[in-house]
């Protein structure tokens, strides 16, 4: 199990996040999301593309580790914290307490602000 968690965490390491460093809390949450969550979840603001990579001709179906795509799904802070603490909502493959304490709160703040497609902070920023 630890090997799986380590592999998923390593797979999540991507490039630069698009959240400005001037937004310290959200930027820190985006970096943590990229490092710890992007192996299974997608969210453009964190440069995270773990929910079935688009355009991959070799990957016809979603993988078991694919979590929700937060570009399409809006989340509330308390729901994100619940999912982090309990390993998601459905008892799926997400490990419980994948991050804890301040890191969990930073990720929850970031996801609650930037998730949700056209209603998200990221989408509004692109329109400016």
State each model region's role.
Residues 1-2:
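Bacterial N-terminal signal peptides that target proteins for export
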Residues 5-6:
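Gram-negative bacterial Sec-dependent N-terminal signal peptides
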Residues 9-12:
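C-terminal motif of bacterial Sec signal peptides marking the signal peptidase cleavage site
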Residues 17-25, 30-69, 86-93, 113-123:
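Periplasmic/extracellular electron-transfer cofactor-ligation site
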Residues 77, 81-91, 95-97:
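Extended amphipathic secondary-structure runs
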Residues 96-128:
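C-terminal capping alpha-helices of c-type cytochrome domains
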């Amino acid at each position: 199990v630890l090997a799986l968690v380590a592999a998923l965490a390593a797979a999540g390491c991507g490039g630069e996040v698009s959240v400005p460093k001037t937004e310290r809390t959200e930027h820190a949450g985006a970096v943590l999301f990229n490092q710890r969550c992007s192996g299974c979840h997608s969210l453009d603001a964190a440069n995270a593309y773990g929910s079935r990579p688009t355009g991959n001709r070799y990957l016809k179906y979603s993988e078991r580790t694919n979590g929700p795509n937060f570009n399409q799904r809006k989340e509330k802070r308390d729901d994100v914290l619940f999912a982090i603490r309990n390993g998601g909502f459905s008892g799926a493959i997400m490990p419980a307490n994948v991050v804890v304490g301040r890191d969990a709160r930073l990720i929850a703040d970031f996801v609650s602000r930037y998730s949700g497609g056209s209603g998200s902070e990221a989408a509004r920023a692109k329109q400016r």
